[in-house]
Every structure is written in structure tokens, then in C-alpha cells.
């Protein structure tokens, strides 16, 4: 990325940051957008100063109050974070006109100025250094590409293995599903058989109850008939005794009559 544009979330001021990664000399970069320490939302220094209330700055996006803000400074591979109090932001100028940032920097930091000629000489003298660094970067990129290629091959092998495992699991799942369907079908059949058996058993129980009731009725009738039979036997015996008595009486009577007739004849 050659450059990036940052924008304040409140006043929408824009700052552009250029990339000096391939330059052989150190490049100092201060990110102009500031970060509130508590909620991490980004504002410009002017907005922080204007919305500050006493020693705190309420974030206009989330209303969280912050006592400090962070400034980020970049120097090649080193990133420094500067934690500042919100009360340390103050307006420096008192005029209404716009400033030329380069002219202002040349005035404020005159002792740190680096002229273009010296910068060009340093750049010319460092061509070999830049070439060697570029070659080192190229070798590193080639090594990274080779490592990434090996990693991609390994991942492809792992992916193929996972695909085979997935196919095996799908086949196993299909078999399990078929077994489940067959078991469900068998369960339905057994359930229907159970219902039929329960109906048949209920019918048998009903028939048994009817037969038991009929048997009880017949037993009662048999008991009544048995009692009647006993009464009839008793009555028969009584009649038999009376008949025997009558027969005996008849024999005695006949014998008496015969005796009387014999006497009369004589």
C-alpha cells in the first residue's frame, strides 16, 4: 500500500500518510489522527480540544469519557505510542488564516532541517545498500514462497484426507440412515402386531369373562338342581317307605282276610 488516508470521525478532516518502506534511510512518521485511550475511537487534536470538559473528553461516538489519548510514531520497524493527557492540548496560533505545514515545520524545527542536496547525496550513496536490501528482501520472499508452497501442499494433502474422511463418513451415515429406516419399519410392523395381539387378547379376555359368567350361572343352576334332586331323592325315599309300609299292610290285610275266610268255611 503506497499511501492511506485517515479521516477524523467528527470534523471529517483528512490526513494522507505515504509509505517509505523501500527507502534505505529511516523515515519518521507521526500518525496525525489521535486515539482516545478508553474507547479507542479516533479524533483529531482540534476536536479533542473543543469537546474537552475539564480534565475529561467524552467520546462523541460512544459517550465514554477519557483522560488520555494516544499518539503513534513509526520509525521503520519500531512503533512508539505516546500517551498524553487531554488537558495538554492547547491552541498555538491566534489567527484565522490557514498554515502551510511545511513552512511551519521549517520554522519550528529549523535545527532538524535536512536540505534536499544532502538528502539526494545520501540517496545516491545508498544505492548499493538499497540493492543489497532489495536482494535480501527478494531472498526472504522466495524463502517465504517456498515455505508457503510446502504449507499449501501439506494443506492440500490434509484437505484430500479430510475429503476422503468426509466421503467415508457420508457413506457410513447413509448406512446408518438405512439401518434406522429398516429398524423404524420393523418397529412399525411390531407395533401393528402388538396392537393386533392386544385386540385378540382383549377379545379372548371378553370371551373368558362371558364364559366365566356363564359358568357361574350354570354352577348356580346346577346347585339349584342338585338341591332339587336331593329333595326329590328324599321325597322318593319317603314315598318308597310309604309304599313299603302299604305293601306290608296289604300283606297283613290279605293274610287276615284269608284266615277269616278259612275259619268261616270250616
UniProtKB/Swiss-Prot annotation:
Record key words, sorted: Host nucleus, Metal-binding, Zinc, Zinc-finger
InterPro entries, sorted: Znf_C3HC4_RING-type, Znf_RING, Znf_RING/FYVE/PHD, Znf_RING_CS
A Pfam family the protein falls into: zf-C3HC4
Compartments, as annotated in UniProt: Host nucleus
GO cellular component, one term: host cell nucleus
MF-aspect GO terms: zinc ion binding
Main location: host cell
Domain of life of the organism encoding this protein: Viruses
Keyword Zinc-finger: yes
Start-end of RING-type zinc fingers: 8-63
Task performed by this protein: Plays a role in the proper expression of late and very late genes.
Protein name (Swiss-Prot/TrEMBL): Zinc finger protein CG30
Amino acid at each position: 500500500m503506497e499511501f492511506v488516508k485517515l479521516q477524523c470521525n467528527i470534523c471529517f478532516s483528512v490526513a494522507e500518510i505515504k509509505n517509505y518502506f523501500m527507502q534505505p534511510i529511516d523515515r519518521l512518521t507521526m500518525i496525525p489522527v489521535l486515539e482516545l485511550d478508553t474507547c479507542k475511537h479516533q479524533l483529531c487534536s482540534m476536536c479533542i480540544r473543543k469537546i474537552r470538559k475539564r480534565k475529561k473528553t467524552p467520546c462523541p461516538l460512544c459517550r465514554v469519557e477519557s483522560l488520555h489519548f494516544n499518539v503513534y510514531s513509526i520509525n521503520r520497524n519500531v512503533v512508539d505510542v505516546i500517551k498524553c493527557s487531554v488537558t495538554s492540548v492547547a491552541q498555538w496560533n491566534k489567527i484565522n488564516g490557514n498554515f502551510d505545514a511545511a513552512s511551519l515545520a521549517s520554522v519550528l524545527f529549523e535545527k532538524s532541517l535536512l536540505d534536499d542536496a544532502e538528502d539526494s547525496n545520501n540517496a545516491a550513496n545508498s544505492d548499493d545498500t538499497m540493492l543489497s536490501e532489495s536482494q535480501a528482501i527478494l531472498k526472504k520472499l522466495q524463502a517465504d514462497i517456498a515455505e508457503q508452497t510446502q504449507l499449501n501442499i501439506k494443506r492440500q494433502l490434509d484437505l484430500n484426507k479430510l475429503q476422503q474422511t468426509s466421503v467415508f463418513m457420508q457413506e457410513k451415515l447413509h448406512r446408518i440412515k438405512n439401518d434406522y429406516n429398516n429398524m423404524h419399519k420393523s418397529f412399525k410392523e411390531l407395533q401393528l402386531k402388538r396392537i393386533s395381539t392386544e385386540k385378540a387378547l382383549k377379545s379372548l379376555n371378553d370371551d373368558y369373562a362371558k364364559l366365566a359368567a356363564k359358568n357361574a350361572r350354570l354352577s348356580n343352576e346346577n346347585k339349584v338342581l342338585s338341591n332339587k334332586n336331593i329333595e326329590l331323592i328324599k321325597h322318593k325315599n319317603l314315598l318308597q317307605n310309604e309304599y313299603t309300609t302299604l305293601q306290608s299292610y296289604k300283606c297283613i290285610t290279605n293274610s287276615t282276610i284269608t284266615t277269616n275266610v278259612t275259619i268261616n268255611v270250616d
